[in-house]
Amino acid sequence: MAAQKTKKKYVVTLNDVSGTLDNDLFKKMASKGDITSVSVTEVVYQTITVTGTAYATIETDEKTFKMSYFNTEEYGIIHCGGGTLFDESLGDYMADGVTKFRINSVKCKLGTGYKAVPILE
């Protein structure tokens, strides 16, 4: 007799979505835990054009955490933890209408952080 699989908890709650991520397909992907994205750490020193954002709370059996998703023209969806330096810097400049950024790494007390630097055109 086969061992019975236990279902692990993975619940994604979208707190806020905008732009190209504000659609039924992305919401369905989130509800199924099926968002495939690239970590911001994998695109350091690259330029991104942000077309949509989503802020989520994710609950698992072990923990609850926040995640931020950004749809980009260049890399598709990228992600970072909610409330990080990257998340805060990108959100701050997007509030001013900026959509094009360079991702830089910066030295912090606890190691390396990532920051969204607006591209002035």
Protein language model features and the residues they cover:
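GIY-YIG-like beta-to-alpha core
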Residues: 76-88
